[in-house]
Design a protein with these regions (language model features):
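C-terminus-biased signal that marks the final domain/tail of proteins
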Residues: 2-134, 140-142, 237-273, 277-398
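Short, well-ordered beta-strand elements within core beta-sheets of diverse protein domains
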Residues: 230-236
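Internal mixed beta-strand/loop scaffold within catalytic domains of large alpha/beta enzymes
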Residues: 97-228, 370, 382-384, 390-392
């Protein structure tokens, strides 16, 4: 057995606050690690941690409107981790707080934000690397790649989900596997960051969900439902069809920022749902597969796309993913082995689906495939590679 992220199982029959408190106590180190990581990332954009918390508090009302139980649950998370509610809110609103272009051109604002963070006792972890320039290229790198296969495209007649989560390697120690439940008792398992409600995971009913970050020109402009709250809400759904209904309801409250949510269910259906403050749409499978990276594919949302850096690898990774999906057209149906090969694809070097850390970039700022995840909703099975997938095995955790 290789290293695996800590597994936290929440006790049965707890109130929202008690669930959060138990989660917070069990993941206090990971939540505090996340706070330090994101305080520095926000500061790079000219946003101090105090300012980030103030921005996050604007989302309280819309979160309560969607699910009144989540605010007391987050208060419990904060108390358990020896943090404040606004800290937990800021972590769960991190996609909305980061500006659409991620990196501010105002270096003076970044410097002031760093001074404010230092005064709060928040360490600058980039000083262990290259200080001033350590994070400069982080925002130009790509992020996650996903591939979902429906019942017609799979080797066993069931839908499969796969994704690499690419981010700053520093966040790997903050990852945990959480098994919890909502106010109606519907259980779920999620691979998430300390201090965050949910990320990639599966509901007890057999809906697998993931996340590819997108950037919209209207991200964070008005308080809509935060992306990570959307993910937690969808983990109460049992199917792709039910997720569509949930997204239609969330749209009445508006989405806080853009993301793509790849999904697969126990009945064999898959899709990708692109969400943004301007609306949402669906990418349907072609020849049994749906592939996504980090730019909008739906024509109806093309005007939402924020400009991307020239070095962003979203398009090369999409092409690589489509190459794997094309095997279905040639009669080569996709199963567990093929999805492992997909998530370990290094054919495009540092722009690959499986991203190894770039040795030319300071260690603390390297974007890499932090983890890989494969899910089979039919059997509620989850496999996780807790490092760059090329380096480790996929271990079954559920």
């Amino acid at each position: 057995m290789i290293f695996m992220f800590p597994l936290i199982k929440i006790s049965k029959s707890l109130s929202p606050y008690e669930r959060g408190l138990e989660f917070g106590k069990a993941s206090a180190l990971q939540a505090q690690h996340s706070r330090i990581t994101y305080a520095r990332l926000f500061a790079t954009c000219g946003i101090s941690w105090t300012a980030a918390c103030e921005r996050a508090e604007r989302y309280t009302q819309v979160i309560e409107a969607l699910d009144p139980a989540l605010i007391p649950e987050m208060q419990g998370m904060a108390d358990g981790a020896a943090l404040k509610l606004e800290d937990i809110l800021a972590l769960n609103c991190r996609t909305e707080i980061l500006p659409p272009n991620f990196l501010s051109d105002e270096t003076q604002e970044a410097a002031l934000a760093l001074v404010a963070n230092t005064a709060m006792g928040l360490p600058d972890w980039t000083l262990e690397a290259d200080g001033e320039n350590a994070l400069k290229d982080v925002w130009k790198e790509g992020e996650c790649t996903s591939l979902c296969v429906n019942a017609l495209g799979s080797a066993d007649g069931h839908a499969w989900f796969s994704q690499n989560w690419d981010w700053v390697g520093r966040q790997r120690p903050a990852l945990i596997v959480l098994q919890s439940y909502d106010e109606q008792g519907r259980t779920f398992t999620t691979l998430t960051e300390g201090g965050m409600l949910a990320k990639i995971g599966m509901s007890k009913g057999g809906l697998a969900i993931g996340l590819n970050i997108l950037r919209s020109v209207t991200d964070g402009a008005t308080p809509g439902v935060p992306v990570h709250v959307v993910l937690r809400h969808l983990l109460s759904c049992q199917s792709v069809a039910e997720a569509r209904l949930a997204l239609a309801h969330i749209q009445t409250l508006k989405f806080g920022a853009a993301s793509n949510i790849p999904v697969a269910d126990a009945m064999g259906e898959v899709a990708c749902f692109e969400i943004s403050p301007g609306g949402w749409d669906e990418v349907k499978p072609v020849d049994g597969c749906v592939v996504h990276t980090n730019h909008f594919l739906c024509e109806s949302l093309s005007d939402q796309q924020s400009p991307m850096g020239l070095a962003l690898s979203s398009t090369p990774r999409l092409i690589s993913g489509l190459r794997h999906a094309a095997a279905v057209k040639q009669g080569q149906l996709i199963g567990f082995e093929e999805l492992q090969n997909f998530l370990r694809d290094e054919s495009d070097g540092l722009w690959s689906i499986c991203r190894s850390p770039d040795p030319a970039i300071p260690p603390e700022a390297r974007v890499e495939s932090v983890a890989g995840i494969i899910m089979l909703p039919h059997t509620r099975s989850i496999w996780i590679a807790p490092n760059v997938p090329k380096l480790v095995a996929f271990e079954k955790i559920a």
